[in-house]
C-alpha cells in the first residue's frame, strides 16, 4: 500500500523527461514577454515587462474579498472564513520586529487554525488567502469531524499536506478578480507558470533529502 523511494525516483525521472522540456518552453516565452535576453537566476521572478500583478485594495478590502469568495464557494468555507475573521485568526500585516515567513498552525485547545504571514503588496499576499487558507480549512474541518479524529493525525503528513493548499489556490480561481481587478489575467498566467515550475524544484529538494 502506498509508495516508496523507488516509486518517487520513477516520478522524478518522469518529471525530468516530460515536464522539464515543457517548462523550458514556458520560460522561453516568459523571457520573450519580459524582453530579458540573457536571463540570470535573479531574473526568475520577473514575469512581465511592465511588472508582476499586485493585489488592488487595502487590508480591509482584501479580507472582505476573501469573505465574499469563501461565502460563494461553499457553505463549509463560508462557516470557516467567518470563524477565522470574526475570531481574528489572521496575523498577516508586516510590522517592525515581526519574524519573517508565512504559515498555518493549529491551536488544538481551541480547535482553530491560525494564519501567520507578512504581506508586502505582492501577489503572495493573495496566495496567503488561498494557499494557507487551504491548510487552515483542512485543520478546521478535521478538528470538528464527527469521527473524532485524534489530534496527532488531524494534520496530514508532509507528502499529502499540500494537496489541500494547492487545491484551494485553483478552486478559488473564479474569484481572483476580486483581488487583482484588471490584472487578473496576468495573475492567472503567473500562478499557472509558477505552479508548473515548482514540479522540478520539489523533485530536486526531494532527491537532495
Please tell me what each predicted stretch does.
Residues 1-209:
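Cation-handling catalytic/transport regions enriched in His/Asp/Glu
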